């Protein structure tokens, strides 16, 4: 058995689906994991945001856009005016959920997972039907019935031991020897849909490979293999022919957009090689990852965006000692704030984290939040976004010493302004503003 994984970019249109068929032609004993098509997960996140804020009309309009996008792919593949009953049923189920199930802030992450999972369910349904139509008999697998996960939404881990008999039974009971399943999703013990984290389809494929004792796993991407830098930023980036498991884990953890960080462990445990190959060139070797490759000899450059620096200091200026670390990290774990870099001095503990503060989720859970903000705050207590348990004090004064920096998203074209500051370095160096 081989395992192939195709990301959303590789199946974003009908030509991509046809190319998937071209790649798997001639393969027997193959398990294909597929992500949502194109930017469907982003679109479903918009649906959820509208649902969360009570704008059901906007949510329905976005669902209509998603339906039209997939119908255009279906028309291109099968011929105009062809409908797929399973796809229509999934879209109707999504519509009913958004319009009839009231939003519950205490179950926000569960509702999020249930919403975004429709992307993978729809994409695999279309692809499975198309492969059957094109002469490749296959068995569609609902991964929610075969992956048992933690009761943890948005970033669950798969319980491999509990999932193994379920997936093996599904495979053994099928006459077809090509299987199509969803990446990114599973279910908790209570049957609720869970997701494995954004870009978690790599991890899904690795778990499948582990359970089925696959001879190899291949991720088909829009690059020639793993490069030593992002070619969109560094045009001179070079392809790496071979990597070992340890280097790959370190690169993924450090932010290299090559593979999901949780992918390697299930493969390493059974010494299953991983290939990263270009979906535009079936014959290209790409990059091989296994336990035998030598250390990489060329420099690797990783640019990680949207990072935040937290500086923690005790009020009495007591030393930062190791016994205080568990308190800090238990809070970070509680709200799933991922830490990428740690540095401590005598009285400060500095943490570099992903810019995902999760204040709304914490407030919705009843956590009392007190913010002292130097400047203007747009988070309003007592609204959908700002709960009554939140207390905000904004300090505005013409004689405040620090620089004030204002960042506006501006529809994807950010604008940054600096105000009320002179150009003395003390006003700019080592300042972290919370807006």
Language model features: what each stretch is:
Residues 82-83, 259-262, 273-282, 335-347, ...:
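Flexible, glycine/charged-enriched surface loops at secondary-structure junctions
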């Amino acid at each position: 058995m081989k395992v192939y994984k195709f990301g959303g970019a590789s199946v974003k249109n009908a030509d991509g689906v046809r190319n998937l068929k071209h790649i798997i032609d001639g393969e027997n004993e193959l398990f294909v994991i597929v992500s949502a098509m194109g930017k469907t997960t982003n679109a479903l996140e918009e649906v959820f945001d509208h649902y969360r804020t009570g704008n059901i009309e906007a949510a329905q309009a976005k669902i209509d856009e998603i339906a039209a996008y997939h119908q255009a792919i279906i028309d291109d593949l099968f011929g105009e005016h062809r409908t797929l009953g399973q796809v229509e049923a999934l879209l109707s189920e999504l519509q009913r959920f958004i319009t009839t199930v009231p939003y519950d802030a205490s179950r926000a992450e569960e509702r999020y997972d249930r919403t975004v999972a429709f992307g993978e369910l729809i994409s695999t349904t279309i692809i499975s039907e198309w492969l059957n139509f094109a002469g490749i008999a296959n068995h569609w697998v609902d991964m929610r019935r075969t992956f048992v996960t933690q009761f943890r939404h948005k970033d669950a881990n798969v319980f491999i031991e509990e999932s193994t008999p379920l997936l093996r039974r599904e495979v053994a009971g099928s006459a077809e020897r090509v299987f199509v399943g969803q990446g990114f999703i599973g279910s908790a013990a209570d049957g609720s849909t869970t997701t494995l984290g954004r870009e978690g389809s790599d991890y899904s494929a690795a778990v499948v490979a582990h359970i089925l004792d696959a001879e190899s796993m291949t991720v088909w991407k829009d690059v020639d293999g793993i490069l030593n830098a992002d070619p969109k930023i560094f045009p001179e980036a070079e392809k790496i022919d071979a990597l070992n498991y340890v280097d790959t884990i370190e690169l993924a953890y450090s932010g290299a957009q090559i593979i999901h960080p949780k992918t390697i462990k299930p493969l390493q445990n059974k010494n299953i090689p991983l290939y990263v190959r270009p979906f535009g060139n079936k014959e290209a070797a790409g990059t091989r990852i296994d336990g035998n490759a030598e250390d990489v000899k060329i420099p690797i450059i990783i640019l990680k965006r949207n990072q935040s620096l937290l500086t923690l200091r005790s009020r009495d200026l007591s030393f930062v000692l190791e016994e205080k670390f568990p308190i800090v990290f238990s809070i970070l774990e509680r709200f799933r704030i991922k830490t990428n870099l740690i540095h401590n001095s005598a009285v400060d503990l500095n943490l570099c984290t992903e810019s995902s503060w999760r204040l709304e989720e914490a407030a919705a859970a009843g956590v009392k939040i007190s913010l002292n903000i130097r400047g203007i705050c747009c988070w309003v207590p007592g609204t959908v976004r700002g709960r009554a348990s939140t207390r905000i004090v904004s300090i505005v004064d013409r004689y405040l010493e620090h620089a004030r920096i204002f960042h506006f998203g501006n529809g994807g074209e950010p604008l940054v302004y600096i105000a009320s500051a002179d150009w003395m370095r003390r006003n700019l160096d080592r300042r972290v503003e919370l807006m």
